[in-house]
Amino acid sequence: MSKTFPTVGIIADGLMAGMFISPGKSLGIELLCFDSKDAGHSDIQKCEVVTIAAQSNSLIIAKKLEAAGVTVRPTFSAMSAASEAINSAVDKATQICVMVARSPHGQATTWAPTQVISSNKKWTMSISPAPQLTSALQEKAQKLAMDFSAQIGAVGVIAVEMSVKEEDVSVVNVHIHPHDSGNWTIDGSVTNQYEQHLRAILDLPLGDPSMTATYVVTGNFHCGDKPNMYRPYLHLMARTPALKFHQYKNSGAPGELMGHITLAGNDLPKVIEEIEHALQYLQGEIDE
């Protein structure tokens, strides 16, 4: 790899690619972003390393790039192994996600396990650390995720989804790239998942994954009845000054994902209450 600042190729859908821009600039890294449809673009050959965070055709893309001599992280082999870990037979149990970062030389870190809450088959809220887990279960889940990432030879950030029932923890799905479940790290961790992913694929020392508060709650908001998605800022910013907004788009179809909000604090019931209020207000379910 060149001793000058490297060029990194990001193959991802628009929203995901945009998440890498700020940490990339902070590290002085040149990013070239490509849609999954542009994976054959000649500029990819200019990149010292390419990472794939596309939701579709990622295995096909990785295989073609590696055959062309491009350094891809994570590799086709790791991505293929991760895809085999999916277990669709999940009973009613606590759903958590553990984010892991791993570099080529084997340094690995993990963030606090996150409880994932869904409604109508949509991911709506995450709570970190997962409040229903004992410290022993948290450590068990983190170790399971770390061991899995090493087993498949993952490089970069991966999201390991798990089912927890009593003392049993099992892997049910794996996303071998940064994931929505880790968006709480943008405002709630010393090093967020997107910066950590860049560090990992470039084989740089990994950052501190510690939380910045006792609890961090993140909520996804979808397009509702608000004709103006900007006006809710007036009420919500005045009510909860510590609330962090990440608006992906200004308009959309009903039910479409519009962005996420995050709040950190030490009083979990209060933090959840504020996030729930903000989600309802943003989605037009309440007016005050």
Where in the sequence are the language-model features?
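Internal nucleotide-binding/catalytic subdomain
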Residues: 84-160, 164-166
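ATP-binding N-terminal substructure of ATP-dependent carboxylate-amine bond-forming enzymes
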Residues: 1-80
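Redox-cofactor binding/interface segments in oxidoreductases and associated redox assembly factors
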Residues: 51-52, 87, 220
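Generic secondary-structure signature for well-ordered alpha-helical cores
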Residues: 59, 70-71, 103-106, 118, ...
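Active-site "cap" helix and flanking loop/linker of ATP-utilizing ligase/carboxylase catalytic domains
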Residues: 140-160, 176-224
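A short beta-strand motif that forms the metal-chelation/ATP-contact edge
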Residues: 168-178
